[in-house]
Amino acid sequence: MAIDKHATPMLDQLETGPWPSFISGIKRLRDQHPDARINAVTNDLLGQLEHSYETRKGYWKGGTVSVFGYGGGIIPRFSEVGKVFPSSKEFHTVRVQPPAGNHYTTAMLRQLADTWEKYGSGLITFHGQTGNIMFIGVDTPNTQNFFDEINDYGWDLGGAGPCVRTAMSCVGSARCEMSCTNELKAHRLLVNNFTDDVHRPALPYKFKFKVSGCPNDCQNAIERSDFAVLGTWRDDMKVDQAEVKHYIADKGRQYYIDNVITRCPTKALSLNDDDTLDVNNRDCVRCMHCLNVMPKALHPGDDKGVTILIGGKRTLKIGDLMGTVVVPFKKLETEEDYESLVELAETIIDFWAENGLEHERCGEMIERIGLANFLEGIGIEPDPNMLSHPRQSSYIRMDGWDEAAEEWFARQAEAGR
């Protein structure tokens, strides 16, 4: 049956630019999908969006929608103009956790798409900044039906609200030669251990895990996660001098100096007269620029592990925060190594849950109570690698210095150092 299409003159303008338009995608569902229900839903969605553009006002409001046994994972959206656009008056979003490293098979994707077209609008986002697969547009009764079906063949809801959120990891060694750790294993162990905290919000605010296999940090873990695991190495960078000479012969000596040598932030690289490369590994800060420019000539070292940073977040209360190093280097090879990683995460979340204020991220708590108190609370000794910059004031308080020194020496003696 033909539907009465809403006029969308303002939305039509979004299709005139050089880039793909989400409006075109929604119109294809409205005009070409064989399911009349999806045609009607997307038609009213376009109508409401056009109305919002005309009035410069959003008409979605929140509410409470969940599936049995879960306290999160659904983003409720109810329309304030549902009488005018009845087919899209309930347009909830379902967050579904992706596989570690976003490794899918086409069969998995077809199965998910078929189930979503059966119950939802047909609109899917891979992936939001949360890391989830976002299934956008389902009414309240079909929310449970959709979840039941995908859960039967192995998928689970992601996090929403004050809980442990969906973890993310890069594709890792599956296609990246810079990988320094088993990203997918670390990802799965953390997610599996905190599944209950993902589904039942009971924390001060959100807590995110992200795992990047090398300092390139393709997952933006340093900037966007409360618990960032970054692959790294602590021995010397591996240099293939023959490939260095080949690169210089191909690009030219001046190009090499301008785009590799002078781009090193700590001036750790120098080019010899015979076109070989010297690396001052002590000064290398793992910025990865030279390795990215010359992936055949330069490679991470053999002594690989991870660096753990805590407290990254984007703007909310006190602006953007980069993660703070709490473990400069940790091997992840044995099962005991991975268990200790999970135990550290448990300790940090427990401390934050007890000491964080409502709606306060872990990094904001560290800013409030101080890094020294945070490290003491989670049982980690301070390390010079945790400093982001030298002291800015030469005036410091010395009261309590002797007692603090005695406590430090006592801890060192207890640890047998």
Swiss-Prot record:
EC numbers: 1.8.1.22
Cofactor note: Binds 2 [4Fe-4S] clusters per subunit.
Binding-site residues for siroheme, renumbered to this chain: 218
Positions annotated to bind [4Fe-4S] cluster 1: 170, 176, 214, 218
Disulfide bonds: none
InterPro entries: DsrA, NIR_SIR_4Fe-4S, NiRdtase/SiRdtase_haem-b_fer, Nit/Sulf_reduc_fer-like_dom_sf, NO2/SO3_Rdtase_4Fe4S_dom, NO2/SO3_Rdtase_4Fe4S_sf
Residues annotated for [4Fe-4S] cluster 2 binding in this entry: 264, 284, 287, 290
Catalytic activity: [DsrC protein]-trisulfide + NAD(+) + 3 H2O = [DsrC protein]-dithiol + sulfite + NADH + 3 H(+)
Main enzyme class: oxidoreductase
Keyword annotations from UniProtKB, A to Z: 4Fe-4S, Heme, Iron, Iron-sulfur, Metal-binding, Oxidoreductase
Cofactors (names): [4Fe-4S] cluster; siroheme
GO molecular function list: 4 iron, 4 sulfur cluster binding; dissimilatory sulfite reductase (NADH) activity; heme binding; metal ion binding
Its biological purpose: Catalyzes the reduction of sulfite to sulfide. This is the terminal oxidation reaction in sulfate respiration.
Classification via PANTHER family: BLR3264 PROTEIN, FERREDOXIN--NITRITE REDUCTASE, CHLOROPLASTIC
Protein's UniProt name: Sulfite reductase, dissimilatory-type subunit alpha
Organism (species): Allochromatium vinosum (strain ATCC 17899 / DSM 180 / NBRC 103801 / NCIMB 10441 / D)
Gene it is expressed from: dsrA
